[in-house]
Amino acid sequence: MPNYTAPVEDMMFLFDKLRNNKNYNDLEKYKEVNSELVKDILEEAAKINQNLILPLAKSGDENPTVLENGVVRTPPGYKEAYSKYIEDGWTSLSCDPKYGGQGMPKTVSAFFDEMLSSASLSFKLYSELSIGAYNCISHHATDEIKEKYLPKMVEGKWSGTMCLTEPVCGTDLGLLKTKAIEQ
């Protein structure tokens, strides 16, 4: 089984250095965020990543997600782990409280993302596009669209996706041809 120990103390060192930055401390929305709260969050994050997500790393590497007869089948253990992941509120860590988020600084969610990536990158990728979709909607959508989509995304009931326009790959770069001409 793979081994991973979340570097909580290193993360706390970084958080405390950032927290001591006067500009960061002056942000009203983070007035209640302190080292004790962040350490508690990171210690819980370490537990879920080391005890629940890490054991899935091999399963995710060896059992790809497949579409069978219109049904998506994920690697063994993923469905249960994702249910626990959303039940514990990890999808909402740095999301706006207006939509059900916890309102933590992006720094805290970056620490969690590092743990999640280290424990099982394949599992992390299930939520990755949702974060991007959440950010896109929260920064650019109308209030009506935000009210419709963001609460369900924050709750983990709806997820985001990437819509690729190229039929053969995720980018057109592979279709480019270059030629070197001596000058």
Question: Where would I find each of the regions flagged by the language model?
Answer:
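Amphipathic, small/basic residue-rich leader segments at the start of a protein or domain
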Residues: 1-125, 144, 148
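Short, well-ordered loop/turn and helix-capping segments at boundaries between secondary-structure elements
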Residues: 20-21, 118, 135-143, 155, ...
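Glycine-rich, Trp-frequent "lid" loop and neighboring beta-strands that shape
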Residues: 94, 102, 144-183
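Residue-level "edge-of-site" marker
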Residues: 98, 129, 166
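Contiguous, well-ordered alpha-helical segments that form the cores/surfaces of helical PPI scaffolds
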Residues: 106, 110-114, 131-136, 162
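N-terminal glycine-rich flavin-associated loop
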Residues: 125-143, 170
